[in-house]
Regions:
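Zymogen propeptides
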Residues: 2-151, 167-168
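Active-site-adjacent helix-turn-beta-strand microarchitecture at beta-sheet edges
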Residues: 63, 130-211
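Extracytoplasmic
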Residues: 80-82, 92, 118-120, 153-155, ...
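Short acidic-glycine loop/turn motifs at beta-strand connectors
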Residues: 88-91, 160-166, 197, 222-226, ...
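Short, solvent-exposed aromatic-acidic interface loops
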Residues: 100-105, 172-176, 233-237
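Small/polar glycine-rich anion-binding or flexible loop at a beta-alpha turn
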Residues: 104, 263-270
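Structural recognition of the beta-strand scaffold that forms the well-ordered cores
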Residues: 122-126, 157-160, 167, 221, ...
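Conserved, well-ordered active-site substructure
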Residues: 134-152, 205-258, 268-300
């Protein structure tokens, strides 16, 4: 009788342990914030942003002040609604990044529009959604938050330097600390690169599962010093099919970019400008924003 009681007790304890472990795993994946580090100092200069906004000239498709000029145009490419943003800044300091909830950590997310508004962004798009992965460098505002090499480093990362220049780097070739020493301020790890040295780096026959698929897209490129372009496309709807990576690269090249890089796309693709969402983000078949880990933005 004692044997059965002991066996029952052990079984019950083991079952409770398994249940607790499974429950925690589910919570960690879908619920718990698991904030690793709160970013105490934001780079946003609220006073400067308010001053600039007060004197800026704005329309539905443009923004202009003494330091920042933004022009938005829309066009149809391959049955897809595409938004092109031309950006000129007086200093690379106005090209910025921000974490959702001003916090670095897995499962810490917010809609692009919310993070943008919290940082007084003039223009913003979703970033690389670093929180969806457990590996890959995370460098923001010159701080290394994660230094483990991404599982697939062949895609390359977009390194943004203090002077505003872009370079495609590969994590298995250089450490995160060395990148910061070399002047990297922000690093975006999604990919792949679309254009390097003015030439398209993807083709219609490579990465068929990704390049040939029509999807919403977000990409950023550099034309010249302090002159950038952001392209966002809608997709997955009857009105807008979406772009392949090659088609996205073609759009970028047509604007004369030297380097262009593919950011997180699909349901994450969101364009925020002058206080509102411009495109039509799709999440689970509906027009709505997806919460993401981070944004790239123009602002003070």
């Amino acid at each position: 009788m004692k044997f059965f009681k002991k066996s029952y007790t052990y079984a019950a304890c083991f079952g409770l342990l398994l249940t607790s472990s499974f429950s925690y795993s589910i919570l960690k994946t879908f619920v718990l914030s698991d904030a690793i580090q709160t970013v105490k100092a934001t780079t946003t200069d609220t006073k400067a942003a308010k001053k600039a906004a007060a004197s800026a000239t704005t329309t539905d498709t443009s923004y202009s002040d003494d330091n920042i000029q933004v022009t938005l145009t829309e066009k149809t490419v391959e049955n897809t609604q595409v938004y092109i943003v031309d950006i000129t800044v007086s200093s690379a300091d106005y090209l910025k990044t921000a974490f959702a909830q001003n916090t670095y950590g897995t499962n810490v997310t917010a809609k692009t529009s919310v993070t943008a508004a919290n940082n007084s962004a003039i223009l913003a798009v979703n970033g690389d959604y670093y929180g969806a992965n457990s590996t890959g460098y995370v460098i923001r505002n010159g701080v290394v938050y994660r230094d483990t090499v991404r599982e697939d480093s062949s895609n390359g990362d977009l390194a943004i330097y203090k002077d505003g220049s872009f370079k495609i780097i590969y994590e298995d070739e250089i450490s995160a600390d060395q990148l910061v020493k070399d002047g990297v301020v922000n690093l975006l790890a999604f990919g792949p690169s679309l254009v390097e040295n003015g030439e398209i780096t993807v083709d219609t026959n490579s990465e068929v599962g990704r390049s040939m698929a029509s999807n919403p897209r977000t990409a950023i490129g550099i034309i010249d010093e302090n002159h950038y372009i952001i392209v966002v496309s809608d997709g997955r709807t009857s009105e807008s099919e979406g772009l392949s990576l090659y088609q996205l690269a073609e759009v970028m090249k047509s604007y004369g970019v030297k380097t262009a890089y593919n950011l997180d796309g699909g349901g994450s693709s969101t364009l925020y400008f002058n206080g509102q969402v411009i495109n039509k983000p799709t999440t689970n078949g509906t027009i709505s924003e997806r919460a993401v880990s981070d944004i790239v933005y123009i602002g003070y």
